[in-house]
């Protein structure tokens, strides 16, 4: 049984990302004092996988289709029950009661992200989640930033700044989920404190690799990058992929499955009808590593440490390729997972949404305008009370 310290407040963070694999959850304890209120301690973690049927339905909702409103509403209810199951596991594992938790910060599942049109949609049913758990729920974190002229993404760099910045060296945090994004954490400024210089989505993370291995082997992902490691990068295909205009756009910018999907990949592959599937997988890994390395070389040439979180941190082949890609760009830099800094790579995003829930609870801004492009700091989220 966990003893709840009266000097801390408990929040749950729930995250399901563009990989569409399941829900990662953490039970986090935050100190109540102002100086250390960002220093989260993970008391428990849980993972609830999506069924193949739910993944298919979420995938179809990424693009326009028939009867979308009803299908999305039903999926939202299913996601809420999955989230509730994750919360139940966290409470059991932490030895805590629902009434000891201040709030749940839940991201939901992105099915549309159109900041250029002024909206984003993360499907879930936070009202149902509050009813099922008896805990206040804070959701819809991205819309407020978009309303203020921002991209609504990435939001996690604000958390990266709070927990990973170092006063004497520039660090880059790389989150490799379905999409990859970077947070550049500058060394201490003359005025004191660390400045997050910039953060943005670099392009595909695991999304294209996962898609290709699913199409060819029926697997959800390439374990340890073993299939890619057995292939050879196709230079002309890599160049064709790198010609995507998104990569040349200046930040702030964000992307997702709206751009990097099966049709995008098929269009690139149509230029090269003769190819080995393993070679394509190796090329897609090189695409992820190259676009991350290009972004770091351009925006953080003084980087001293690159730390990686998300599912990509568990792919040794991809980690190796990233290190090589950085070296080819003249960056002799240490590449580690966030485990080296005390947080498991698969916990970072869920912890970030527990932190964002805490920020909402304290009525503090959760976005970084330098990252998202919003006109100013904004309090993110909407409250769904349990009572």
Language-model region placement:
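Short beta-strand-loop/turn "lid" adjacent to the catalytic site in phosphate-handling enzymes
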Residues: 65-124
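Conserved ATP-utilizing enzyme core subdomain
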Residues: 8-10, 22-50, 194-289, 293, ...
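Short helix-loop-beta connector
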Residues: 5-8, 97-100, 167-169, 300-304
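Glycine-rich phosphate-binding/hydrolytic loop that grips phosphoryl groups
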Residues: 20, 149, 282, 286, ...
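Glycine-rich phosphate-binding loops at beta-strand->alpha-helix junctions
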Residues: 111, 303-325
């Amino acid at each position: 049984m966990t003893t709840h310290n009266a000097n801390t407040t408990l929040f749950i963070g729930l995250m399901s990302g563009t990989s569409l694999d399941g829900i990662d959850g953490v039970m986090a304890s935050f100190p109540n004092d102002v100086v250390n209120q960002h220093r989260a301690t993970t008391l428990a973690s849980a993972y609830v996988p999506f069924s193949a049927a739910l993944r298919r339905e979420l995938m179809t909702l990424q693009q326009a289709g028939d009867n979308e409103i009803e299908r999305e509403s039903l999926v939202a209810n299913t996601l809420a029950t999955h989230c509730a199951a994750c919360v139940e596991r966290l409470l059991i594992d932490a030895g805590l009661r629902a009434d000891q938790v201040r709030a749940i910060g839940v991201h939901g599942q992105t099915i549309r992200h159109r900041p250029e049109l002024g909206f984003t949609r993360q499907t879930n049913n936070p009202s149902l989640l509050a009813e099922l758990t008896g805990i206040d729920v804070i959701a819809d974190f991205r819309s407020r930033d978009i309303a203020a002229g921002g991209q609504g993404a990435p939001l996690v760099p604000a958390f990266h700044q709070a927990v990973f910045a170092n006063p004497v060296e520039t660090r880059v945090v790389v989150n490799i989920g379905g999409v990859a994004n970077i947070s550049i954490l500058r060394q201490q400024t003359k005025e004191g404190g660390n400045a997050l210089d910039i953060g943005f989505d670099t392009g595909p993370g695991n999304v294209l690799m996962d898609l290709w291995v699913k199409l060819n082997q029926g697997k959800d992902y390439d374990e340890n990058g073993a299939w890619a490691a057995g292939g050879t990068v196709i230079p002309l295909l890599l160049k064709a992929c790198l010609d995507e205009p998104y990569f040349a756009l200046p930040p702030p910018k964000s992307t997702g499955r709206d751009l990097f999907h099966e049709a995008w990949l098929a269009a690139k592959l149509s230029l090269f009808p003769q190819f080995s599937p393993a070679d394509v997988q190796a090329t897609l890994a090189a695409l992820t590593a190259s676009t991350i390395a290009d972004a770091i070389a351009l925006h953080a040439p003084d980087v001293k440490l690159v730390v990686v979180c998300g599912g990509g941190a568990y792919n040794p082949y991809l980690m190796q390729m990233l290190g090589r890609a950085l070296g080819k760009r003249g960056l002799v830099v240490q590449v580690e997972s966030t485990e080296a800094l005390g947080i498991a790579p698969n916990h970072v995003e869920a912890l970030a949404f527990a932190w964002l829930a805490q920020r909402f609870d304290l009525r503090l801004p959760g976005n970084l305008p330098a990252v998202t492009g919003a006109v100013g700091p904004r309090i993110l989220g909407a409250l769904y009370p349990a009572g």
